[in-house]
Design a protein with these regions (language model features):
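Feature captures the catalytic ectodomains and active-site-proximal regions of enzymes
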Residues: 1-380
Length: 380
């Protein structure tokens, strides 16, 4: 596995005083599937050589595995660190809903419109992973295939192996519509199904594993994280052993992580005086202005939070290419007026954005720890 600077260039490793932005024209999660399923005559330099011209490809996504976290723990992941490749960028926000949709569709967030974890849709805030609003299940009121209608995997219908409980979720319907879903309940079944399908001559198989992300959210980046990385590395080793000789196994992720622990603050009251509602998530918080308050909101947010967040208006983010060179009208309508994009390890709380436990590890922002993810490959 190459060093970071050798793979993407030292200039890509920005100081976190400046936001790290995706490389939408190069090594990015949005470009992996097109490179594998619709390759050009000239292979992109960011695609590891073992993935070139393989008769069969297995793409494994390890949710939550950032390049910086892996690079600091090479001794725990001998299989991953022996593979060819290095870091690429994911998309913004650095969040599962957005990145997995970019991976499956081969489109930027501005094109596919799943532009955050919690997005503004028709006057409501939709939690994309749960596909719920304040009124509950939103699969009827906000049909997933209408909110995101682009076909996954360039219209191919590959087998996709994911957790069985995700099969009928709104998010699965939005970003994996039309694929051949194979559910698993324990990791060994994920490996077994990948082996079965590749031995049946499937040319492309996609497998999703969420253990690292789950552990990091609950326990942070410490002993539990290290143990889960060891387990994930073993899964990849088992996949390489299970597939036919010559199969290319490609491993990537949707985002990295930072440990926020108790470093969570509410949006300042003087800022909230100009806010009608909030969307996004703790490290990429969208503020939707009260009518006529957009300029006042921008000024107040910069004054109160400018030291510990990148404060940007919707236009500044769109014009800056954060979501890609094109942002559709539908995607634009799902954004707030001002974003608080957290620096360092800070997160912004919001009463309507809660879960079953307090998050220790988080993601969503534009730091290098969250933006850079591995793209690795090896032949069985």
């Amino acid at each position: 596995m190459v060093a970071a600077g050798d793979h993407v260039g030292a200039e890509a490793w920005v100081d976190d005083e400046q936001p790290a932005l995706p490389d939408y024209s190069g090594g990015c999660t949005a470009n992996i599937v097109p490179a594998l399923l619709d390759p050009c005559d000239e292979r992109p330099p960011w695609l590891p050589e073992p993935a070139w011209d393989a008769d069969a490809v297995v793409l494994v996504l390890l949710d939550g595995l950032g390049w910086e976290q892996l690079d600091a723990r090479r001794h725990l992941a001998p299989t991953l660190t022996s593979m060819a490749g290095g870091p690429i960028t994911t998309v913004l926000p650095t969040t599962t809903a957005t990145a997995l949709t970019s991976l499956s569709t081969g489109l930027t967030p501005g094109e596919h419109g799943v532009i955050g974890y919690r997005i503004h849709v028709h006057g409501e805030v939709l939690n994309v992973l749960r596909w719920t609003t304040a009124a509950g299940d939103a699969r009827q009121t906000i049909p997933p295939q209408k909110l995101q209608s682009n076909l996954p995997f360039l219209g191919h219908r590959p087998p996709v192996i994911t957790r069985a409980e995700f099969a009928r979720t709104g998010f699965t319907m939005a970003h994996l519509d039309g694929v051949r879903l194979e559910g698993y309940r324990v990791p060994s079944t994920l490996v077994t199904e990948i082996g079965r399908l590749t031995r049946a001559a499937e040319p492309f198989v996609y497998g999703y594993y969420d253990g690292i992300d789950k552990v990091c959210h609950e326990y942070g980046i410490a002993d539990h994280y290290d143990a889960e990385l060891v387990a994930a590395d073993r899964i990849v080793a088992d996949v390489l052993a299970a597939v036919p000789r010559g199969t290319a196994v490609v491993v990537t992720s949707d985002h990295g992580q930072v440990e926020t622990a108790g470093n969570v603050i509410p949006v300042d009251a003087e800022v909230q005086a100009h806010v009608a509602l909030q969307s996004g998530e703790g490290r990429f918080r969208w503020l939707h202005a009260r009518p006529g308050h957009a300029a006042l909101l921008r000024a107040a947010a910069e004054d109160k939070h400018g030291e510990h967040a990148w404060v940007r208006t919707r236009d500044e983010i769109v014009d800056g290419g954060w979501f890609g060179p094109t942002v559709t009208p539908d995607a634009l309508s799902r954004l707030g007026d001002v974003a608080l994009v957290a620096k360092g390890t800070l997160a912004f709380s919001e009463p309507n954005d809660t879960g079953p436990f307090s998050l220790v590890g988080r993601h969503g922002s534009a730091t290098s720890a969250e933006l850079y993810v591995p793209l690795l490959a090896a032949r069985a």
